C-alpha cells in the first residue's frame, strides 16, 4: 500500500503515509490560457483571474487557496472550460496540460513558458510498511546515482509522446 508521484507535503494531510526520501520525478505546475497577455510568474499573479484546476491536484489547490477557483473532476473538463471562456486560466502540469490539449484537438490555448512551480515527487508507503523504507531508499539512491531513474523517466516520456 502506498502512493507514487506525490509532493513532499502530502503526508501532512495523510498521516498514515511515510515518505521515501528520494525524488523519483518532478512536476512543472504550469498556466494555460487563451490570452497571450496573461504571463503570471507567481501564484499571487493569478488572483484577478478565474482559475480552473483538476480536483486532487494538491500543488494547485494549495497555490490557489482563497482565489476564484473552479475545480473539475478531469483535466479534459478543465480545458473544455478554458476553451469555452468559462475560466481565464487552467492550472495543470506541463505534460498533462499539453497532452489534454492535443487529445481534445483544442486550438488557441498556450502554456505560459515559465512554470509557476517545479516540485519533486516521491514514493510514499503506508505506515504498516514503514520497515521497508530504509531498504527502498538505498535502492532508489543507487538508481539515481546510476542514472536509472532518469532513464526510466525519459523512456516513459518518449512512450507518451509516441501515442
Regions found by a protein language model. Name each.
Residues 1, 18-19, 44-45, 75-95, ...:
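Short helices/loops that flank or line small-molecule/ion binding pockets
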Residues 1-45, 56-59, 113-116:
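Acidic, polar ligand-binding/catalytic clefts
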Residues 4-15, 89-110, 114-117:
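A ligand-binding cleft/hinge motif common to bilobed small-molecule-binding domains
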Residues 9, 58, 77-78, 96-97, ...:
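Alpha-helix capping/helix-boundary segments
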Residues 25-30, 102-141, 160-163:
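Periplasmic-binding protein-like
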Residues 35-40, 47-50, 55, 123-160:
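Extended ligand-binding regions for polar small-molecule ligands
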Residues 41, 50-65, 94:
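Secondary-structure junction motif
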Residues 67-81, 111-114:
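Short beta-strand-to-loop elements that line the ligand-binding cleft
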Amino acid at each position: 500500500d502506498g502512493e507514487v508521484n506525490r509532493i513532499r507535503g502530502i503526508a501532512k494531510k495523510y498521516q498514515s503515509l511515510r515518505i521515501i526520501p528520494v525524488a523519483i520525478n518532478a512536476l512543472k505546475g504550469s498556466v494555460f490560457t487563451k490570452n497571450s497577455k496573461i504571463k503570471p510568474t507567481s501564484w499571487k499573479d493569478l488572483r484577478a483571474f478565474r482559475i480552473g484546476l483538476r480536483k486532487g491536484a494538491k500543488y494547485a489547490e494549495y497555490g490557489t487557496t482563497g482565489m476564484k477557483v473552479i475545480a473539475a473532476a478531469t483535466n479534459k473538463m478543465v480545458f473544455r472550460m478554458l476553451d469555452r471562456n468559462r475560466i481565464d486560466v487552467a492550472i495543470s502540469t506541463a505534460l498533462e496540460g499539453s497532452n489534454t490539449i492535443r487529445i481534445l484537438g483544442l486550438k488557441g490555448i498556450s502554456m505560459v513558458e515559465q512554470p509557476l512551480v517545479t516540485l519533486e515527487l516521491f514514493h510514499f508507503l503506508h505506515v504498516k510498511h514503514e520497515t521497508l523504507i530504509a531498504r527502498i531508499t538505498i535502492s532508489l539512491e543507487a538508481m539515481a546515482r546510476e542514472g536509472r531513474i532518469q532513464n526510466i523517466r525519459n523512456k516513459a516520456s518518449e512512450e507518451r509522446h509516441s501515442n
